[in-house]
Amino acid sequence: AVVARLACFADGLDLGLEAAGFEVLGCIEHDQVARRSLKLNRDDWRIIDPPDITAVAEVLQPSDLGLKPSELTLLCGAPPCQPYSKAAMWARNAWAGFDDDRAKPLLSYLKLVETFLPRFVLMENLPCFVTGPRSVAQRVADEFDSINERTRSNYVVSSAILDAADFGVPQRRRRAIVVAIRDGLDMVWPEPTHAHAPVRAWDALHAVGQEDVPSPVG
């Protein structure tokens, strides 16, 4: 199973994808510090240029990653979260939501969906991405409906708000997860495994041990 990644940052999500059996073919990342980190730690990855998803979406084709149309298993990314944050709500102009210029990469993300037609699409963002007065959930669903009409695909979009602590991560981290499946199937969301017995941060840190601490490089 192969995946193309958008907005990798420090590749935390990719560790989970790799543990689930995915191979990362290429990634797009705008932040220069994150790009340097990826090149140092992921020298087998293709770091796609230019580092701008809007520009890349206009030119990138499946063949550039050695794929045929519809051959990509998963297109995965996290569109900019600032337009859907509580900080944006408290700002002078309040929530701009999809009208915020920082939300525009989402359209480029969806353009890449139409270009690659992956079997699965995964997006992660703040809870207000799919709930509240500035939610873009309906806009995203409408865009997938348009993709279906133009490409004769059958994407079905599902969303949920999940807390990482409910699945064994020693941190309360609620995030909106959006999944689209090309085969016309609804997402079956996993049942929480640690909802009543969360892992404590001390337990996780204590288990590391001094011998597992990596040596600094660079």
Over which residues does each language-model region extend?
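Class I S-adenosyl-L-methionine
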Residues: 59-72, 84-218
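Active-site glycine-centered loops adjacent to acidic/histidine catalytic or metal-binding residues
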Residues: 9, 78, 162
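Short, glycine/acidic-enriched loop or turn micro-motifs at the edges of active sites
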Residues: 32, 55, 81, 127-128
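SAM cofactor-binding core of SAM-dependent methyltransferases
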Residues: 4-55
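N-terminal Rossmann-like NAD(P) cofactor-binding module of classical short-chain dehydrogenase/reductase
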Residues: 4, 74-76, 122
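Glycine-rich, histidine-containing beta strand-loop boundary motifs that form or position
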Residues: 28, 79, 124-125
